[in-house]
Amino acid sequence: MTKILFICYGNICRSPTAEFILRDMLEKTGLKDKFYVSSAAVSDEEVGNGVYPPMKKLLLAHGIDCSGKTARQVTPDDYGRYDLIIYMDEINHRILDCMFDHDPDGKLRNLLDYAGKTGAEISDPWYTRQFQTAWDEIQEGCEGLFRTLVEKETVTLDFSHCTNLKDLYNELRSRMEWQDWYGETLDALWDILTGLPHKGSFFVIIPPNESASESVKKYASRIRAVFEEAGVLIS
């Protein structure tokens, strides 16, 4: 499981919004169990307070409920707990870099870097009062982050060229930790999907062409069903 921590100054506007936007994306795509997402503040000024009402209103307008979320302050121990620690501006970055001993494992990231805006900051709407602007920028960053997370862990199986069962087996062997296995059952495939070689991976299956034989289509459907049951299929 990949663990992600969003950071802003007070943990009542930007970072909780990013937390819940990304959670929503992961839930809608069936990936929520593959990631743990949270948020925190670099300051202690808002500890215990809920999401700032204008940002909470924007979340609700998009069907996202952030009830129960309260601000907390980031701690040095969080560096070991999370795989990615994503900040909103350079002030956040400087504080985190100092707290985490200059980021020896390279975990610190700027959110808008994921949107192709290297070094760009998301201004604190508590001061600017530009809540919609902050929302738009956070959403853009989260969309880029989501694509990066999914692409990093995604394996594509292309059955569109398969004309017989041997082609299907060859595609599985070439793209997965797949042994020379043939048979009518798919128990081996289940073991591979849920075992260590592909732990944390997601899969995209490109189906056979319409011109493929019925036996190929039928077997490809059975393979797809195993991926769905294992909870690792994106599309």
Tell what function each PLM region has.
Residues 87-88, 183:
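Short beta-strand scaffold positions
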Residues 79-80, 101-104, 196, 227:
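Short, conserved loop/helix-junction motifs that constitute active-site signature segments
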Residues 152-235:
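Positively charged, polar, low-complexity stretches
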Residues 36, 65, 107-109, 153, ...:
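Conserved beta-strand segments of alpha/beta enzyme cores
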